[in-house]
C-alpha cells in the first residue's frame, strides 16, 4: 500500500544521507589533498590528480590521474558493507607492486588523511624518479 511505500522511501533516504554524511569529511580531505598536490608537487610534465565524487551515485570517492579512465583509480574510498557503523575503507593502488586496503573508523579522518598523503607523495616521488 501507499503508506508502506512512503515509509520505505523515507528509510532509503535516511540511509543514503547517513552514507553521504559519513563520507563528507573524507571527500573534503581528499579534495583538498588533490588540490594541494596539484598546486605544489606536480611538475609541468606530469598529469594532475582528479578527485571524483560519486557519493550520491555509488557511495564512492576516488582519486585518479586526470587522463585515466574512472576504473583506473589510485585511491578508492567507500563505506564498508554500505554500513556507516562498520567504518570507511580506502583501497590503495598507488604502488603497482602492492595493492592494499585499509579500514578506518568514521572519526579517524586525520589518520586516513595522513595515509592518503603518504601514498600519493610516494607515487609522485616514483614518477619523478622515472623521469630523471
Regions found by a protein language model. Give the residues of each.
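Ampiphathic alpha-helical segments that act as solvent-exposed interaction surfaces
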Residues: 94-132
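Generic hydrophobic, helix-prone segments enriched in Leu/Val/Ile
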Residues: 10, 19-22, 29, 77, ...
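Amphipathic, interaction-prone secondary-structure segments
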Residues: 43-81
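Charge-rich, low-complexity alpha-helical coiled-coil segments
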Residues: 1-21
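Coiled-coil termination/hinge junctions
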Residues: 19-55
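Intrinsically disordered, low-complexity regulatory segments enriched in Ser/Thr/Pro
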Residues: 67-110
